[in-house]
């Protein structure tokens, strides 16, 4: 990820999702489907925010078809630990206009 000026622990401003963010979302899609008991045919990352902690939290708005969106939080540990991405939170029944906030 590009370097950005922000306070540790603070959320960045929302920005358009990149191919890297789509890849992160795709990797945790099975975790979300297991937790929500739903299958998402469409799973397109739209915008994201990030938060530097002991690793990085990615807050991602995902379009799942029609007028439906979900907000997910994905934790990526420090690279040297080589651990898998983990879905640590989600909100369903979101709309295109719902603000992507910390939750």
Curated annotation (Swiss-Prot):
Predominant subcellular localization, coarse grouping: cytoplasm
A single cellular component GO annotation: cytosol
Keywords: Cytoplasm, Protease inhibitor, Thiol protease inhibitor
Key word Oxidoreductase present: no
Localization per Swiss-Prot or TrEMBL: Cytoplasm
Family: Belongs to the cystatin family.
Function (record text): This is an intracellular thiol proteinase inhibitor.
Name by which UniProt lists this protein: Cystatin-A8
Lineage: Eukaryota, Metazoa, Chordata, Craniata, Vertebrata
